[in-house]
Amino acid sequence: MALKIALSFACSLVLVSSACYGGGTEKKHYTPIQYLKNYALSSCIADGYQSKDVVNDASAGANGYKELGSLDIEAYSEAAVLGRKFLAKEYLSQSGEKLIIMKCIDFYHSKELDRLARKFANKK
């Protein structure tokens, strides 16, 4: 079940990425903080799953956001480390699933990631 959710989420990321960067006339431009947070979410998903397709797609998305972002490279490294801390948290599910997507979404919306992003955005 978790793999299906991850694949569904990864496919959504691909669709968003292709719509944003796929040669269309309209391209999405994010703020530096949004690029970092998008990177953090993608990186968390890549670190959380073992499925080759999910890991490859999420890693490609993370790398794309890092390349397009303008914050110091250290911001992206720190975000990845912080994401791994969220993945290590114990989430209980009634079905016994690891709830990786839930952890990554909670990470994306966390105060910790917001603080990290603002710290590096204020250095610019």
At which residue positions do the language-model features occur?
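Bacterial N-terminal signal peptides that target proteins for export
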Residues: 1-9
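Bacterial N-terminal signal peptides
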Residues: 8-17
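Hydrophobic alpha-helical segments and their boundary regions
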Residues: 6, 31-32, 72
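N-terminal secretory signal peptides
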Residues: 20-62
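Compact alpha-helical subdomains of small soluble proteins
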Residues: 54, 58-124
